[in-house]
């Protein structure tokens, strides 16, 4: 077969791609750091996180009370608050600083603060305020304290409304406080818990973040092992852009295809989360999501000079990315700039799409905007990766040529010296 023929070039390209795939796959399982981020973290971290929030709710959350009012109204509020199943008035403090110290020592998870003019404002018919301070290190305790405070405040407000309305019958009081009777029935998050609301989004985000960490760490290792400190080694197998990109991408796609099915199908079943996922839908959805994450990670890997750099680039972005998806923070309250910025990351559309699939039983047709966005990201990041790797390949070849020229000049100089 002639080397100039198209068939030979195709076969040679496939052979080189398989060689790159084999080399990259071997590095994934030999490099402890990459192995941890690509295999162990996706396997173990979702189990730990799901186990923490598997109870969905917590009871008797310790709370510090700072009552500067010392009035009947503040004592009524505290009594109703302490009678709730979710929260508990554990400590009574003389100042806010004393209560803050209890929070710092983790003796309590929140503070109720009643100002000195609390009862005075109520008696004047003015709006009074109760300060609620919550420790957000655990969302379950935050939810228990905040929602209990809201419920007690609403109950007391209803009593104030009845007093000011001046009704004559119980029916008048009912109409004053609840003019329209309704029953609240949760449709999708049937338990009303934190786990069913947030954890599906976290599972999808874990796929992206661990992949970026693994690809970045592998890129840092490649630079450290390369004599010229370049991402792509100078070798006959690394002679084309597409064979390099496809060879590397195939490794992470194969690994995370398994991890994706584990996170989206196995973990929710293990902890009895609401899951309406079907095999056909999730397979079709994970294909563009994993591909977009792979090419996004390969594109960013060119920025990694050392193994440790990827930690600085990726880890701190996890919480902001979760907020910008509109899951834990209303999308309507996110500024337009940050909404546009969130479209850069595959996790934004991946989380939104998966939540609809998991909680609402949506099909691919129902999440068509997110599905299209992921395919667009796949195409854009693939082209960007090819351009970036093309530049990296040129740089590697240029440095290799310069090194070879310098070596030849040194040999010639040594020969001249020896001849003299």
Predicted regions and their residues:
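Hydrophobic alpha-helical transmembrane segments of multi-pass membrane transport proteins
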Residues: 44-47, 185-268
């Amino acid at each position: 077969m002639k080397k100039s023929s198209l068939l030979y070039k195709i076969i040679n390209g496939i052979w080189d791609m398989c060689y790159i795939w084999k080399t990259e796959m071997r590095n994934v399982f030999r490099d402890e750091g990459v192995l941890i981020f690509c295999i162990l973290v996706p396997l173990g971290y979702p189990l730990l996180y799901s186990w923490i929030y598997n109870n969905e709710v917590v009871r008797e959350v310790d709370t510090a009370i700072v009552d500067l009012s010392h009035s009947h109204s503040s004592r009524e509020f505290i009594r109703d608050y302490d009678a709730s199943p979710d929260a508990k008035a554990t400590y009574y403090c003389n100042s806010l600083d004393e209560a803050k110290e209890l929070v710092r020592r983790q003796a309590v998870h929140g503070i109720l603060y009643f100002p000195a003019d609390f009862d005075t404002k109520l008696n004047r018919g003015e709006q009074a305020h109760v300060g609620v301070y919550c420790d957000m290190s655990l969302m379950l305790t935050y939810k228990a304290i905040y929602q209990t405070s809201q419920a007690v405040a609403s109950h007391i407000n209803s009593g104030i409304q009845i007093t000011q309305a001046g009704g004559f019958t119980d029916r008048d009081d009912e109409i004053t406080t609840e003019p329209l009777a309704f029953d609240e029935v949760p449709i999708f998050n049937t338990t009303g818990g934190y786990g069913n609301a947030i954890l599906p989004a976290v599972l999808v985000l874990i796929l992206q973040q661990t992949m970026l960490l693994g690809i970045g760490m592998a890129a840092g290792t490649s630079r450290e092992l390369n004599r010229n400190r370049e991402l792509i080694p100078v070798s006959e197998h690394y002679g084309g852009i597409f064979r390099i990109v496809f060879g590397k991408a195939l490794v992470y796609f194969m690994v995370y295809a398994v991890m994706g099915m584990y996170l989206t199908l196995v973990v929710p079943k293990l902890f009895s989360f609401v899951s309406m996922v079907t095999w056909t839908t999730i397979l079709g959805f994970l294909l563009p999501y994993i591909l977009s994450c792979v090419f996004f990670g390969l594109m960013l890997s060119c920025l990694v000079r050392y193994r440790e750099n990827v930690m600085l680039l990726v880890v701190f972005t996890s919480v902001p990315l979760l907020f910008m998806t509109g899951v834990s923070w209303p999308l309507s309250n996110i500024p337009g700039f940050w909404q546009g910025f969130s479209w850069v990351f595959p996790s934004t559309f991946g989380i939104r799409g998966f939540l609809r699939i998991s909680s609402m039983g949506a099909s691919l047709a129902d999440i068509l905007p997110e599905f299209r966005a992921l395919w667009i990201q796949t195409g854009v990041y693939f082209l960007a990766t090819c351009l970036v790797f093309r530049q990296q390949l040129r740089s590697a070849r240029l440095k290799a040529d310069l090194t070879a020229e310098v070596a030849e000049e040194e040999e010639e100089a040594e020969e001249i010296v020896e001849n003299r």
